[in-house]
Amino acid sequence: MNHIALFEPRIHFNTGNIARTCAATNTVLHLIEPFGFEISDKHLKRAGLDYWDKVNIVYHKNLQDFMNSIADGGQLYLVSKFAEHVYSDVDYSDDKKDHYFLFGREDTGLPEEFMHEHRDECIRIPMNDEHVRSLNLSNCACMIVYEALKQQEFRGLELVHTYEKDKLK
């Protein structure tokens, strides 16, 4: 199973968009406190639209609480622009295994000491950093979870769907 973990998220729109992606992909969302917004924030709810009840959300009091919760197994990946390994070069194909994709705060990322401790688990999305400091958090979460799902052959997701008012028929 795939998991997206957000360390101290600051921007409610990002968290809401990521929640919507989690609902669409059967991905568990882990939210690590403290947040830069109120969970009841109307903008957060609007960004997630009416999918909040479809998202499996796990709340953690801090980073150590999150780490304790995954200590029993699974693979942790820290997503950072400072990583050496490209996310698409990693094997996520085992869909029986828990894959935890941990994203840092939008403004400061993950704690530096923590990243050094988990250096081998760090992955990055390639980009031209001459023009841009970073990519949008919700876009990054979406790219990485869909790469994992692609390698897992999109098991559990609809590959073909017929809509009552299909605009292509």
Curated annotation (Swiss-Prot):
Positions that bind S-adenosyl-L-methionine: 79, 104, 125, 134
Catalytic activity: cytidine(34) in tRNA + S-adenosyl-L-methionine = 2'-O-methylcytidine(34) in tRNA + S-adenosyl-L-homocysteine + H(+); 5-carboxymethylaminomethyluridine(34) in tRNA(Leu) + S-adenosyl-L-methionine = 5-carboxymethylaminomethyl-2'-O-methyluridine(34) in tRNA(Leu) + S-adenosyl-L-homocysteine + H(+)
The protein's Enzyme Commission number: 2.1.1.207
Location in or out of the cell: Cytoplasm
Listed GO CC annotations: cytoplasm
Keyword Cell inner membrane tagged: no
GO molecular function: RNA binding; tRNA (5-carboxymethylaminomethyluridine(34)-2'-O)-methyltransferase activity; tRNA (cytidine(34)-2'-O)-methyltransferase activity
Family, as annotated: Belongs to the class IV-like SAM-binding methyltransferase superfamily. RNA methyltransferase TrmH family. TrmL subfamily.
Name of the molecule in the record: Putative tRNA (cytidine(34)-2'-O)-methyltransferase
Lineage, uppermost ranks: Bacteria, Bacillati, Bacillota, Bacilli, Lactobacillales
